[in-house]
């Protein structure tokens, strides 16, 4: 019988997984974590031996993280192979087989997703003899096109749809599109589909609806939700203060990639206002030039960043005498001295009689 000495899983694999999922930082250590449970796993194909995990659980902050070591046992050769260590904050299905590329064998996915943030680590599997796992890395672009590197920058901050669209465009204009480049595109497109499905959902909370669209880089669509909800416009900045870190990591990369996008400028300024204060934000806005679309967006997102509207000049309070023709005509008193010059009485005041 094959035997293999199994070591403990290091604590850093959990911390790194959570940091990647949240796109933030997390403290790491070299603490050894025990493997306590044996769990079998479905095989990607028939007659490929037995796949199983030795697993454990650990509380990391607010998350209960499942961690483990993946093994393969070849029945024909009685060979036992340790493949990879892993961790996942999703205890129900931390590992799965899923066809995401055009390869005959499905990929092994490790789910690092947290909340609304999809994040899956993918391995391509070669089953010739001892299984070989090859990570689909999104650290460095395979394509030599400079725009491919920019696409991966977008993907690594969670702007999956923008990254997928960029790579698809590069592919249509590329004469040497490799299988490795296609694997990167397939993995990014898989994430994009996941977050797009979330963005299409109807949320009871309008703030969450806007948040998901912003997470997917749908700048104009997020603004349209606000346009249809005047109540939300009044507190949009306040409601997103807890999401500053999540939004800023996307906005800062997106605005560098597309600096002339007026709606994106407005969202960037709104978050920058809370991060850096009004003075620095106004200075940054001034460097972007004028834009009517951005002004209309800022009226909803951060009106305090707009220059004050000029006050209308007060109308002069002049009391105009009515024109002569507008004065009412006073009835003439025949007995009045004014009726005839020099105070003479008008003949009309002398009674006359006519003989009959």
Question: Where do the protein language model's features map onto the residues?
Answer:
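Terminal, low-structured helical/coil segments at or just beyond the last alpha-helical repeat
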Residues: 260-356
